[in-house]
Each structure stands twice: as C-alpha cells, then as structure tokens.
Amino acid sequence: MKFLKKMIQVGLAVFFFGLLATSTVFADDSEGWKFVQENGRTYYKKGDLKETHWRVIDGKTYYFDHVSGEMVVGWQYIPFPSKGSTIGPYPNGVRLEGFPKSEWYYFDQNGVLQEFVGWKALEIKTKDSVGRKYGEKREDSEDKEEKRHYTNYYFNQNHSLETGWLYDQSNWYYLAKTEINGENYIGGERRAGWIYDDSTWYYLDPETGIMQTGWQYLGNKWYYLRSSGAMATGWYLDGSTWYYLDAQNGDMKTGWIYVGNTWYYLRSSGSMVTGWFQVNGKWYYAYSSGALAVNTKVGGYYVNYNGEWVQ
C-alpha cells in the first residue's frame, strides 16, 4: 500500500519485526497529517489531533475509531455517511460526517477498506472446529483451535455487507442476518440447506445457495416448496391431485393418515385416493373429498366402522 511505502526506513523495520518504539511516524503529508504507531496501534494524526472517522488518503479509504482514533482492520460494524452528508476539504483526503446507521465493512491488514461489490469469497480465520457458526461472536471461541475456511458474502454499492434475502441474477439467496436479539454479530454469510425465517422454512441448494422451489427429495423424503420458496404443510393441491405434507415437518405422507377426525389413504406417490380402492386384500371407499366412508352403504355395498367392505 502507498502509505507503507512512505514509512521512514527505521519505522518500516520496527513495524515488521514488532519492535515498536513508543511512537513511529510514517506517511507524512504537506499539512502535517501523518500515520503514527503508538504501542502497536496505528493512528492518523496532526500534532495532538487524531482522525476519528472515515478518511480517504491517497485514494484509499480508512476508518479510525470514533473514540480512540485507532485505525481499524478486519470486519468492522461502523456507521456509513448519510446521503447529502458534508464532505469537508481535508488535506490529502476527505472526512465524511453524518451517520444514520451502521453496517459491516471489511478492511485489509493495512486498514484499507476493501471496495468489494457483488459476490466475494473471503478466507475467514475462526476458532472452532468447523468454522465460525452463524450467530457466534468472534470472542466466543477465543480458546479454541484456529481454523480457516472460505465464506461467500455479497457486498452492495456502498461496499457493506448485504443481509437477509437477496435477489441476484434471477435467483434468490439468503444471507445471514447480523442482528440477533438486538445484538450485532458478523453475519452476511450465504446460507445453504434448510433455513427458518419469519416462521417459515426454506431450502437453499447446498452448493450454490440458490433458493429451491417445487418438489424436492431430501433425506429420503419428499417436500414441496411453493413459488415463494416457503415449505408447504398440510393439504396441497398440485394440478388436480391432492397431497398431504406433515403439518410440522413438511414431509410428504403416504398410506393411512388421520386428519381432522377423518381417515384418508395416500398412494406410495403421495396422491390422495378417491373411489373404491384395495389395501392388503380389503376394499374401501373414499369420497371425492378423500374422506373414508365408514359404517354406511355405498352403491348398495356396506362398509363397516373400519371402512372395510363387508360382503
């Protein structure tokens, strides 16, 4: 990066070998603003003044903590300048003010904002055995073995993480939310498999993350996902055929089912039976609604309380 190239020779050696002096100065400009290292932390200062927000320096964007002034690196949850905010005439760059909300941004090890737009796979260092879990704060796994894995993220035009549902290239994706129970986490990961959102189950392709619709055979069971992606439950009419999907799990049922105080029979394909049908050598009759006829006569034939035709 440009500012590293401008470090004075002594400061460069000290920086890379970790032998930090009390104060190391580099990247000076004509107005006296400069990068300064103090006790292993980097600041942008002019005398006793510290930058404490966004700053564009030599065409690169940095963020300095709004309280301490320390240059940030890695994932940061920080405010983004509002539309129409003031851009002041600062030396060697601009300072942006007016912050309506915070978003997640990614800065490299030199503190430079990574101006990603669209999909980006980032290598993430984590401290748990399978990679950072959704909803896990970084400090939650400080004592665990460090692992690395790649995670797919989507960045908007402001270079911040998108979260929630994303429609891209005619497909829907779901990006993990960063706020859970009022607390902010590092989210934004492209989800895969089953997800539960707003009291509804959805299924995302395990490889691409694309939201699935229609009939899906998963874990040796059939499910139906509506055009919205929502998992169907209960009775479902597909064309002219009725199916029953478990009210809780959504898996397609076959054979005998008891719903609303009524018996129904579903073929091995899941389709609901109507009319006369035979099961294990016994004849039964189901009305056009699929309800099993019991203890009555159908076309002069008697069916008992179990629905079986009695000769």
Identify the meaning behind each predicted range.
Residues 2-311:
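Extracellular adhesion/carbohydrate-binding repeat motifs centered on closely spaced tryptophans
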